[in-house]
């Protein structure tokens, strides 16, 4: 993906705003969402380096798992003008890349 690309329905009603000032923190996605359908709010997804050549990925959204899979019987959540769009190959690929990075590959 490149700057400006969007994944509709990925940022849910719970999301993280401006990141903390942490050395080495990398912003990997950011943008505006509409809180309550009327008020704009910022979300920021980040990767934070750890002390042992590890990292923490903060997707900044409660809906990240919705972009990975939709098993039989799964009922997608929706509320507050937010509804996930379901599995998305880009979310799956981003997650795969993060797991490969975590495993050192």
Pin down the residues of each PLM region.
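Extracellular ligand-binding/catalytic regions of CAZymes and related secreted enzymes
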Residues: 1-105
């Amino acid at each position: 993906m490149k700057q400006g690309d969007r994944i509709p329905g990925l940022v849910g009603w719970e999301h993280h705003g401006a990141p903390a000032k942490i050395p080495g923190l990398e912003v990997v996605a950011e943008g505006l969402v509409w809180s309550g359908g009327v008020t704009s709010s910022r979300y920021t997804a980040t990767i934070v380096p750890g002390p042992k050549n590890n990292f923490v990925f903060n997707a900044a959204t409660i809906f990240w798992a919705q972009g990975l899979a939709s098993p039989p019987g799964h009922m997608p959540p929706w509320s507050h003008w937010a509804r996930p769009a379901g599995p998305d190959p880009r979310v799956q690929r981003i997650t795969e890349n993060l797991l490969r990075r975590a495993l050192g590959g």
